[in-house]
């Protein structure tokens, strides 16, 4: 529902009272990410009216995590509109099928590579895609599982030359008019077209992030946006922080929640490797998700989740990081 710009606190109190009497929440709608214990620190999950940023190095799984959150939200019965600037809809479907198989059959499930091969195959299959994946670690069941929530995920094949913040707003407005409050995923912010001729990337990023924050507030939807690192961040060998993201000052100010991904091997303190070299390989299998900003709760929290990239997913049951972390990368030969 589009929010009115002026409202009496008397009306707000009356609505809160009425909601309490009905046994309903008077606050923000909560969209669980499905990642534990991240949701507990976020007060249950992503919140309507808030902008959440997801940043980190290239190739560490930002899209993987965003798509997995989208899947979890859709599977819970909520709508998702996914603005995809780098992946087509078939690629996203392929990832979801592999992810779904992994959730059901664990590491014995069909791999992302095998699902891609099945999708790309040209041989006739009377049973469709499920038939091509029959006998491959729960592949056919995964196709059926995706089908149960696929209608609730709408993919917008976005274009860096034409898909502006106004286009994003227009698409979301169509959902809201139909009385649907979707999770909005933008993959990724720096690809969103800016109609004004601005001299540098920081200014363009500022325009986009401000527009996404306004969108979240105006329509009462949660927005999850992926953010790329700036040039210095891309060259950095240690831990990426919020100030390593493109347009970092605007991002830090406008966002309600900032999540930063880092490879655990790259950020764990030296003494954890020096005294137990075997840890090095173990740490490579985990990503550290740092809650760098959280307007609704605690921040500066470091959590870890196991990578299962052969199935295009993370293990959603994570832990608080027990080891000391550092901003400087430690190399062990």
Residue ranges and their predicted role:
Residues 2, 6, 24, 28, ...:
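Hydrophobic alpha-helical scaffolding
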Residues 2-14, 58, 102-113, 117, ...:
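C-terminal regions of RecA-like/P-loop NTPase motor modules
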Residues 1-48, 146-150, 215:
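Core recognition of P-loop NTPase motor domains used across DNA-transaction enzymes
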Residues 35, 40-186, 191-226, 232-233, ...:
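Glycine-rich nucleotide-phosphate-binding loops and adjacent flexible coil segments
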């Amino acid at each position: 529902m589009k929010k009115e710009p002026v409202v009496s606190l008397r009306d707000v109190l009356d609505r809160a009272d009425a909601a309490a009497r009905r046994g309903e929440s008077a606050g923000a709608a909560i969209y669980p990410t499905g990642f534990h214990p991240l949701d507990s620190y976020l007060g249950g999950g992503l919140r309507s009216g808030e902008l959440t940023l997801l940043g980190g190095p290239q190739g560490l799984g930002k899209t993987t995590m965003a798509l997995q959150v989208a899947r979890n939200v859709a599977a819970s019965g909520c709508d998702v509109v996914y603005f995809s600037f780098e992946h087509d809809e078939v690629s996203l479907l392929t990832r979801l099928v592999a992810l779904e198989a992994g959730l059901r059959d664990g590491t014995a499930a069909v791999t992302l590579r095998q699902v891609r091969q099945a999708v790309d195959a040209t041989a006739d299959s009377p049973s469709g895609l499920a038939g091509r994946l029959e006998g491959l670690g729960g592949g056919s069941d995964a196709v059926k599982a995706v089908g149960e929530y696929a209608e609730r995920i709408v993919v917008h094949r976005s274009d860096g030359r034409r898909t502006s913040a106004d286009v994003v707003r227009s698409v979301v407005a169509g959902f809201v008019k139909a009385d649907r409050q979707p999770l909005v995923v933008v993959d990724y912010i720096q690809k969103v077209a800016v109609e004004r001729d601005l001299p540098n990337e920081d200014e363009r990023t500022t325009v986009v992030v401000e527009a996404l924050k306004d969108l979240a507030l105006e329509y009462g939807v949660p927005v999850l946006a992926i953010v790329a690192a700036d040039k210095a961040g891309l060259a950095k060998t240690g831990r990426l922080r919020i100030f390593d993201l493109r347009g970092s000052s605007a991002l830090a100010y406008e966002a309600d929640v900032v999540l930063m991904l880092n490879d655990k091997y790259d950020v764990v303190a030296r003494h954890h490797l020096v005294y137990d070299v075997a840890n090095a390989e173990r740490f490579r299998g985990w990503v550290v998700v740092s809650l760098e900003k959280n307007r609704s709760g605690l921040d500066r929290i470091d959590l870890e989740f196991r990578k299962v990239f052969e199935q295009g997913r993370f293990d959603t049951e994570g832990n608080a990081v027990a080891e000391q972390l550092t901003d400087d990368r430690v190399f062990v030969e």
